C-alpha cells in the first residue's frame, strides 16, 4: 500500500481529538435535562450540542442515545458580556450575568461547582471548557471514529455532533474516503501500522490516534485516468447506498427485514472492497492475504 498520499496530508492535517471537559457528569446531559434548561432560558439552545463518545460510533452508523453536551467555550462569557458592557468584570458579576441570561445552565452547573473548580481543564471561569481552536470543525460535516476499536468503525456526521475525548474526527465528509477507511484493505494497513491495545473477545484492539492514522496511504484520484474517476464515483455511490441501508437496518422490526438489510450491506461491502483492491493495484496473492486477515 505505498500508492497514494498519507492520510494526514490528504485531509490537510485536519484530524481532531474529541473534547476534554474535565468533568463529563456536569457537561454531558440527557435530552430531558436539555429540555428543562431550554425551557428556562430559550437562548441556551445554542449552547447545547448533540454529543457522542467513541463507543457510540459504529461502522457506517451512529448509536445515538440522545446524549447532549453543554458547550461554553473558554472566553465566551467575557465576549458575550462585552457586547453590552465595557470594561472588566469580576467572576461574581460574570456568574450573575450567566444566571440572568442562561438560568437553566447556571442552575445545572452550580450543583457541580466544587468539582468544576478543581478541574485542570477549564476556561476563564469554572463553567467554561478549556481553550479549543477547532469548534468550527466539530460543527462542520466530518468523518468520525473511536480512538480504540478492533474493526473499522468510521462514519460520517453532517449534524454537528460534538465528540468525547474517546473519539476523533477528520475535517471532511468525503464518502470516497469513508469507503476506503471502512474497507478490509485499510484495516489491514491500520493493523500493521498501529500497535495492539489489548484484546477483547479474543481479538486485538488498535489505537487510532493521529501518529498512526496520519500514515495510512489514501489513493489519490488522477482525473486524467478514466478508470480512476469511474472507481472513485462508484465507491461514493456504493457508500451512499450502505449508509441508507444501515438506516433501514437500524429501524427494521422483523427478522426478515434485518436479514435483508444485513445481506445488502455485506454485498455492498464486498463491492467496495473489490474496487479498493483495484485502485491500489493489488495482485491476487496480495488480495488473498488481506481477505484472510481478521476483521
Can you say where each PLM-predicted feature lies in the sequence?
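Non-catalytic DNA-recognition/assembly elements of restriction-modification systems
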Residues: 2-7, 104, 218-295
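Polybasic, glycine- and aromatic-enriched phosphate-binding surface used to engage nucleic acids
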Residues: 1-228
